[in-house]
From Swiss-Prot:
Stated name of the protein: Lon protease
Annotated active site: S714, K757
Biological classification of the source: Bacteria, Pseudomonadati, Myxococcota, Myxococcia, Myxococcales
Gene field: lon
PANTHER family: ATP DEPENDENT LON PROTEASE FAMILY MEMBER (PTHR10046)
One of the GO biological process terms: protein quality control for misfolded or incompletely synthesized proteins
Alphabetized SUPFAM superfamilies for the sequence: P-loop containing nucleoside triphosphate hydrolases, PUA domain-like, Ribosomal protein S5 domain 2-like
Known EC number: 3.4.21.53
Residues annotated as domain Lon proteolytic: 627-808
Length: 843
């Protein structure tokens, strides 16, 4: 426990005397002890934050076990002790190196027990001594000492002059300190021994411990008095200047300034007493952090102004917490710290290839950036946006880019964000205000040039609180983001060195201005072969590690893997594929844990094992079954998951020419169906369909998966093909899928999402795909492996579509002859039975 020092003065005399204040017990010379009465070995009492002089009286509170044992022995044996100041006050168990070499012989004149392990005592200084060596460390310190005797002539003229000057200076200092009582002057005047006078003044003047110790170590009287004169003179000048400043400031001091002044005085007193509070230490630490943060000049000016204001605010005030938190944010943000880019192109290529299979266009763009960055050091960070279905590796690709460039990676999820303040932050006037997510992410990154991923940027919302996508315009604008302004900081922050990467499943929901600021890079769905490669080289090893299985524990055959991909997943990415592989790993883990197979045994997974572990197949190729009757065609649709096949069913029934559409269709798709029907009616004669087929017939077109909304013009050719198949009785080929917009003249117009639609058809086992002729160029984006396994028909007119899609070309067929009315039959003619109509087939 730390010893606590007080003074031996009365309450009035204590005020303003400072730490470790000591007074003489009498007016005459100090209490002396004969040199021969001082033992050669003394118990040593270490003293903190004070220097004890001969002739002084000092009360102490002790609690350390070593000190208590020392005091008890000294009182019992009526022996003197040695009081020596510690070099470092925080040292709890000082040794020889932690103590000064000159101390004061003292006698314990009073001892009181204050508690179980606390004592209060009063010691009286007798003489100086010098520590020669420590001879004992337990149970307390003992040292071999040498008494130091001052043999100076007291009645020397120079000594007398020095004493007069000392008393004069002491009176001036006391007058400059009105808080001291008048008795202080009387005490100084009453002391006649010059050595005692010098020691008393040195003990009570407010100077550093090191300078007081220097006075104690100065044995020769004249030198000691001159040293004290120098200390006292410096103290007088400081007090004069302080009083002058006080007089100038107090005249215009407001309540806040007065409070600041008092707190500064309190801080100085606490420092002198060794009781500096945590708040002051924290503020000093905060100031040091701000110095090391490398702040720009304008930011440093604001921070210093706020810090000065903080020092004048009471710690109990809520404003103190607000200002302190604000400065913490400024100190914690990276202003100049950056990570060096790894510009090794081959190393970056190797990292990207190791982490991701395929995605050549994305990898090429990243390597281009690194190449330009290598040639031009001050290049701004690119702003990319990866658009693709779930599970194709958009987020993990951002992590790989950070690893390849050697930068920090931070991810900012924007899904569901509707408040503009989430991006820009709240102003400090609000309770609990914080910076926006951009600044929070920069603090987390701790560098000015991280890779920052803006995940799910297409799922930003907007409401009465503002539009977050509009706030992102400044963030993602290379011409503005060097001075991004967060509402909380209210300072310019440079984001120009950040590499921003956005991710989205859909491009359409992203506002135009925001889309314009980003370089769009589309990630296609994986082909069948790519999924097999990814599973074998990435997913299976990863799941084996996560399930505690050795690399040789499972051998999933390629046939089994194909079965999992074809029968249990139907996706553009590989997320569900990874889940199914995890299911297999868990099944093997159960067998290993239950002892059915050895931990080192290798388990082979075949197709039959897949069925046993994963259960019934969830997906199967149904195009042949669905299109085995006339009136059903297979279309291609674009979805957020990357693309899918879409069956369109048409049927007819007796009626008056009504057209019914079902399947949660949007207006555009309904209009496409109406346009297809109009074209069919205009060309019915050339397709072998009766001209008046709608007079007594109703048509119903249905799009299965009725719970899912559908819209868009690209189903036009599929609707028309299904209607032609229905009305002619010619089936659509089961291995054909199609997409395209149809006009009233039968032209096939280009549509979007070709890459996703082609990959969806490839996954579903389609062999022939009919697409608009003007979409031929879009096949360059389709992976080469998929292009090789598919047959493409590029159609510019519906005649080409029908010729490629139907099992028999209906173009040019003649419609069946209409039967003669019964009333016009010739007498005696034999009635001919009507031929079987092809449109009698029902779905």
């Amino acid at each position: 426990m730390r010893e606590r020092k007080e003074t031996a003065m009365s309450d009035k005399e204590k005020k303003g005397a400072g730490a470790g204040a000591q007074v003489a017990p009498a007016m005459g010379p100090p209490v002396l002890i004969n040199k021969e009465d001082i033992p050669a070995v003394l118990p040593i009492l270490p003293l903190r934050n004070s220097v004890f002089f001969p002739g002084g009286v000092l009360p102490l509170a002790v609690g350390r076990q070593k000190t208590i044992a020392l005091i008890k022995d000294a009182v019992r044996d009526e022996q003197v002790i040695g009081v020596v100041t510690q070099r470092r006050a925080e040292e709890e168990d000082p040794g020889a190196a932690d103590l000064y070499t000159v101390g004061t012989v003292a006698r314990v004149v009073k001892l009181l027990k204050m508690g179980e392990d606390n004592y209060s005592l009063v010691v009286q200084g007798l003489a100086r001594f010098k520590v020669l060596e420590l001879v004992q460390e337990s149970p307390y310190l003992k040292a071999r000492i040498e008494a130091v005797e001052d043999r100076s002539v007291v009645d020397d003229v120079e000594v007398e002059a020095l004493a007069i000057n000392l008393k004069k200076l002491a009176r001036e200092v006391i007058e400059l300190m009105p808080e001291l009582p008048a008795a202080a002057t009387e005490l100084v005047e009453s002391i006649t021994h010059p050595g005692h006078l010098a020691d008393l003044i040195a003990a009570n003047v407010d100077v550093p411990i090191e300078e007081k110790q220097q006075v104690l170590e100065t044995v020769e009287l004249k030198a000691r008095m001159k040293l004290v004169l120098e200390l006292l003179n410096r103290k007088r000048e400081i007090l004069k200047l302080s009083n002058k400043i006080d007089s100038a400031v107090k005249g215009e001091m407001s309540k806040t300034q007065r409070e600041y002044y008092l707190r500064q005085q309190l801080k100085a007193i606490k420092e002198e007493l060794g009781e500096l509070g945590e708040e002051e230490e924290e503020l000093d630490e905060l100031q040091e952090r701000l110095k090391k943060a490398g702040l720009p000049p304008e930011v440093e000016k604001v921070a210093q102004k706020e810090l000065n204001r903080l020092k004048s605010i009471p710690t109990a005030s809520s404003e103190y917490t607000v200002a302190r938190t604000y400065l913490d944010w400024i100190a914690d943000l990276p202003w100049t710290k950056r990570t060096d880019d790894n510009l090794d192109i081959e190393n970056a290529r190797q990292i990207l290839d190791t982490d991701h299979y395929g995605l050549d266009k994305i990898k090429k763009r990243i390597l281009e950036y690194l190449a330009v960055r290598k040639l031009k050091n001050d290049m701004r960070g690119p702003i990319l946006c990866f658009v693709g279905p779930p599970g194709v590796g958009k987020t993990s690709l951002g992590q790989s880019i950070a690893r390849a460039t050697g930068r920090k990676f931070v991810r900012l999820s924007l899904g569901g964000v509707r408040d503009e303040a989430e991006i820009r932050g709240h102003r400090r006037t609000y309770v609990g205000a914080l910076p926006g997510r951009i600044i929070q992410s920069m603090k987390k990154a701790a560098t000015v040039n991280p890779v920052m991923m803006l995940d799910e940027i297409d799922k930003l919302g907007a409401d009465f609180r503002g539009d977050p996508s509009a706030a992102l315009l400044e963030v993602l604008d290379p011409e503005q983001n060097h001075a991004f302004s967060d509402h909380y900081l209210d300072l310019s922050y440079d984001l120009s060195k950040v590499m921003f990467i956005g991710t989205a499943n859909l491009l359409d929901p992203i506002p135009g201005p925001l889309k314009d600021r980003m370089e769009i890079l589309e990630l296609p769905g994986y082909t069948f072969e790519e999924k097999v490669h990814i599973a074998q080289n990435h997913l299976i090893p990863k799941q084996l590690r996560e399930h505690g299985l050795s690399a040789d524990a499972i051998a999933i055959s390629e046939k089994a893997l194909i079965k999992i991909i074809m029968a249990y997943t139907r996706e553009a990415g590989v997320r569900n594929l990874e889940r199914r592989i995890a299911d297999v790993c868990r099944a093997i883990a159960v067998e290993v844990a239950s002892g059915k197979i050895g931990a080192s045994a290798k388990r082979s997974i075949e197709e039959a094992d897949v069925l046993e572990i994963l259960g019934p197949e969830k997906f199967y190729n149904e195009t042949a079954e669905r299109t085995e009757i006339a009136g059903v065609a297979t279309g291609l649709a674009w979805t957020a998951a990357g693309g899918d096949i879409l069956f369109i069913e048409a049927t007819k029934m007796p009626g008056k020419g009504a057209l019914t559409l079902t399947g949660q269709l949007g207006d555009v798709m309904k209009e496409s169906a109406q346009a297809a029907l109009s074209y069919l009616r205009s060309k019915s004669d050339s397709l072998g369909i009766p001209v008046n087929f709608l007079e007594k017939t109703d048509l119903h077109i249905h799009f299965p998966a009725g719970a899912i909304p559908k819209d868009g013009p690209s189903a036009g050719v599929t609707i028309l093909t299904a209607l032609v198949s229905l009305l002619t009785g010619i089936r659509v080929r089961s291995d054909v899928a199609m997409t395209g917009e149809v006009t009233l003249r039968g032209l096939v117009l280009p549509v979007g999402g070709i890459k996703e639609k082609v990959l969806a058809a490839h996954r579903a086992g389609i062999k022939r795909i009919i697409i608009p002729a003007r979409n031929e160029k879009d096949l360059l984006d389709v992976p080469e492996q998929a292009r090789k396994e598919l047959e493409f028909v590029f159609a510019a007119h519906m005649d080409e579509v029908l010729q490629a899609a139907l099992e028999e070309n209906p173009v040019g067929r003649k419609p069946p002859a209409a039967p003669e009315p019964e009333g016009e039959k010739k007498p005696g003619a034999t009635p001919t039975p009507p031929a079987k109509k092809p449109d009698e087939i029902r779905v």
